[in-house]
Structures are given as C-alpha cells and as structure tokens.
Regions:
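Nucleotidyltransferase catalytic core that binds NTPs
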Residues: 1-175
C-alpha cells in the first residue's frame, strides 16, 4: 500500500486498481489461494485508501489471464479511462515473455517501480515506458508466505487487517 501511495504521488495517476489475477500464466494454479480469499486480502489492505480499488475484473475472463486481453477489455468497458500498467522491475525483466507484449507497449503507458534484486536502465527504456523513483520497499508475497510457514510474525510486512485475516483463516500455514 505504501508503494501505491508513492506511485500515486510520483507517476501522475488519479487512482490505482489492483486487479487480482485468478491465473497468472507464469504461476501454477495450485500455488495460489482461492480467488475470493486473495481479493478479500486486497480489499482489507486498501481500506481507508479512497484512490485505490480492489478489482475482480479478471475473474470473469478466460484463464490463464493475459494482461493484453485484460487491458483491451477494460479499455472497452471503461472508455473514459486511460489505463497505465504498473509493474515491478522484476516483471519488466521478463516483459518480452508476456503474451502480446509488443501490443501492450504500443497501446499503453507502462510505469516500472524498483524491486530488490532487479535493475532497470532508465536510459534504455522504450517510448511510453518510465521508471519511477520510489523508495524501495523490499517485501514480497513470497517472503510473507515464507515467514508464515516458518512461524515468524508478519507484523509490519502486511497491514494488520490482512495479518489477522491470514491468521484467522489459517492461510499459508504449514500443512
């Protein structure tokens, strides 16, 4: 959420939609929680953030979810909006592996934010792609899951409401 606040301030955005993806083509479906649980955690994290919205838009789309299809569909459904793709530097490093990545590049603005272990050369970015200068927040969902599996507290890694939801529902706990 802190990163999203920084992006709102530095990237010239009106709002940020967190589109929960039911099936990322780069991840195994078995590794993901139930769609509704993941959406609920995003909703909890965004409470009190009027310019941030949790979206289940991809829940109604074919799986796996391809960003090109999502952006095209959202642009048709919301013609008064201009969508910008926000991705971490780690995703930018693999962007040429994405379905229809050239189409995304030619039709949508892309904003890249720093991620630990990934470096992006701002001078080499194509037109329409920018690197924002935000404070590095080196927390990943993988790290949160590893902490939980090891029985370590996740306070400070996720909002308290999300930590409570994870604990109350036994999510990511060792089996």
């Amino acid at each position: 959420v802190e990163l999203a606040r920084q992006l709102l301030a530095s990237a010239g955005l009106d709002e940020i939609w967190f589109v929960v993806s039911p099936q990322n083509p780069f991840k195994r479906a078995a590794d993901l929680l139930d769609d509704e649980q993941r959406l609920k955690m995003v909703e909890l994290a965004l409470e009190g953030e009027p310019r941030m919205h949790a979206s289940d838009y991809e829940f109604r789309m074919p799986r796996p979810s391809y960003m090109w299809h999502t952006l095209q569909s959202m642009s048709r459904d919301y013609p008064d909006r201009r969508f910008v793709l926000l991705i971490g530097a780690d995703n930018w490093e693999r962007f040429s592996e994405w379905y229809a990545w050239r189409d995304i590049l030619s039709h949508y603005r892309i904003v890249i934010y720093p991620r630990g272990g990934s470096a992006v050369d701002a001078a080499s970015l194509p037109e329409g792609v920018s690197l924002v200068d935000t404070r590095l927040i080196d927390i990943s969902s993988t790290q949160v899951r590893q902490f939980i599996a090891a029985g370590r507290p996740i306070n400070g890694l996720v909002p308290d409401s999300v930590a409570r939801y994870i604990s109350d529902n036994g999510l990511y706990a060792p089996k």
